[in-house]
Amino acid sequence: MFTIDFSDHTNLVKEDWFTQIDKLLTFAKEQENIEEEAELSVTFVDKDEIQEINKMYRDKDKVTDVISFALEEDEPEITGIEMPRVLGDIIICTDVAQEQADSYGHSFERELGFLALHGFLHLLGYDHMNEQDEKQMFGRQDQILNAYGLTRD
């Protein structure tokens, strides 16, 4: 089982897109060969809220498109208790998602999917702090999006 807890602080994301993102991230989970039960949260916020979060937790006083908080980093593993793997939290700024969709010439929904997957891959340990890691992460992102059928068209 894969549980995604959605929260929309903006009231801009249509209910059917919660379902679409759930399907995309479930597909990505399968593509990444994660077989155990897992859960995560996806929260949609505006520019003010993501800037506040970015400043508070990352010491960056600026707006960004997506922030991920991986809950498995440096956490001790609890054995003997049957609990789902808690991957973490993804926070997406809908304002920036719309701006980027307009800039790239694709739909708002496609951009939400892209950002959700980007955040998901961060939760799994992918990063883009150097050129090699960026190439690997963005390549994997494109593979999953294309296999799922969520293209830039």
Swiss-Prot record:
Q: Which GO terms describe its biological process?
A: rRNA processing
Can you quote the record's cofactor note? Binds 1 zinc ion.
Q: Give a Gene Ontology cellular component term annotated to this protein.
A: cytoplasm
Query: InterPro entries annotated for this entry?
Result: MetalPrtase_cat_dom_sf_prd, YbeY, YbeY_CS
Name a GO molecular-function annotation: RNA endonuclease activity
- Kindly provide the name given to this protein in its UniProt entry: Endoribonuclease YbeY
Task: Respond yes or no to whether keyword Metal-binding is given for this record.
Answer: yes
Task: Fetch the HAMAP family from UniProt.
Answer: Endoribonucl_YbeY (MF_00009)
The gene coding this protein: ybeY
Which N-terminal stretch is annotated as signal sequence?
Answer: none
Task: Please tell me which top-level EC class this enzyme sits in.
Answer: hydrolase
Q: Which family does it belong to?
A: Belongs to the endoribonuclease YbeY family.
Q: Which Pfam families match?
A: YbeY
EC assignment: 3.1.-.-
Q: Where in the cell is it found?
A: Cytoplasm
- The positions annotated for binding Zn(2+) are 118, 122, 128
Sorted alphabetically, which NCBIfam families does this protein's record hold?
rRNA maturation RNase YbeY
State the source organism's domain of life: Bacteria
State the needed cofactors, names only. Zn(2+)
Q: Does the keyword Hydrolase apply?
A: yes
Chief localization class?
A: cytoplasm
Keywords assigned: Cytoplasm, Endonuclease, Hydrolase, Metal-binding, Nuclease, Ribosome biogenesis, rRNA processing, Zinc
Role: Single strand-specific metallo-endoribonuclease involved in late-stage 70S ribosome quality control and in maturation of the 3' terminus of the 16S rRNA.
